[in-house]
Amino acid sequence: MSQGPPAVSVLQRSVDAPGNQPQSPKDDDRKVRRREKNRVAAQRSRKKQTQKADKLHEEHESLEQENSVLRREISKLKEELRHLSEVLKEHEKMCPLLLCPMNFVQLRSDPVASCLPR
């Protein structure tokens, strides 16, 4: 089993990197605070993104349900239209008002009365 280089902290690597000036503890502290602040901001951003995705998912589900309800209503209304059209067609075959020729020629003042049974 080969051993890798000894574990070195991120701060130590930045100090040991070529071209870097040795940093003061104050600079190190500032860097740690900045990284912590960045980490917290990243967590907040991920949380916000997750919440937004959850909200969109809920809205999608709600719209799907509404769509389903509306499709069922359309189906019922189409069936009702079909039924009422059939009823009307059957009624037209035997309606005395529609069969009366006086409905089409306006000779009297009250053409409906002449078609009604006496």
Swiss-Prot record:
Disulfide linkages recorded for this protein, renumbered to the chain, are none
InterPro entries, alphabetized = AP-1 (IPR000837), bZIP (IPR004827), bZIP_sf (IPR046347)
Q: What residue stretches are annotated with the bZIP domain?
A: 28-91
Q: What is its main location?
A: nucleus
One GO molecular function term? RNA polymerase II cis-regulatory region sequence-specific DNA binding
**Which cellular component, as a GO term, is one annotated location?**
RNA polymerase II transcription regulator complex
Please state what the protein is called.
Basic leucine zipper transcriptional factor ATF-like 3
Can you name the source organism?
A: Mus musculus
State the gene name recorded for this protein: Batf3
